[in-house]
């Protein structure tokens, strides 16, 4: 893989974006509300893009050190790119738990759209099929199918609880214990899938004869750790800034009388900024398998990383009193929360079928 030591554009993105965020943070009293919010949003996105480039450099180095192929390295980078999204969602969940949950589920559709669009640019053979890495066909497609079952099953359970007034909270919603159990189970699926990915598919799929000058030696572990720490730390800063922008956006739309689903749709796009940055940056550096892994991970990691972490955060916020509940139900069961779960089924099934067909 190339590019781990080339260019300092990521530093300029982090520095410039951080400066814009600082303006929005410390000069907000002297600026119009919309301008301060725009500084937080745009500056935060720039920082997120820079942090993703730093994390790509880190996983590239790890891949060279331990012999990972580009797809596995890209999957690990995709996992790291969830950090700004989770930071942003944490602020939204604390302020508006119901909206935060809806935004989390809607990011699945944004990710599915990005994966579908990016897959359309992949080269195809005479039969019209694209060459897909074995890990995508055998691991990611299993996650797509499992996610379809999770969304359908959870949505139906919520529907039945509400219809029959069942459960500890009379069908009004899911409690702390429910969120812990569901979130923990979903997160365990991702842990197992990641271990299987590294165990079965981390090596090169095909050996290629090296032609030309000898490859550059891999970076030191200290350099790898430095890129990783910078990427993670700045992704938290960027996610925090985008989260502040999201709060202003939700409040403004609510004050203007727009339905909350409009704000949720817009927030789902901003929540996916880290994954988009990873895809664009990897593709621009001609790391196509890394970009494909990031695009696929943006879909498969929503139900098994982002959603369970959001559920666990809701449980923790409720237990610590940050979220107040009258009946003990933390996540309400209503039309919107149930429908976003049930509507997660179609894109998962479509992607599972599409990947299976191209992987034959």
Regions found by a protein language model. Name each.
Residues 1-360:
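Hydrophobic alpha-helical segments, chiefly the membrane-spanning helices
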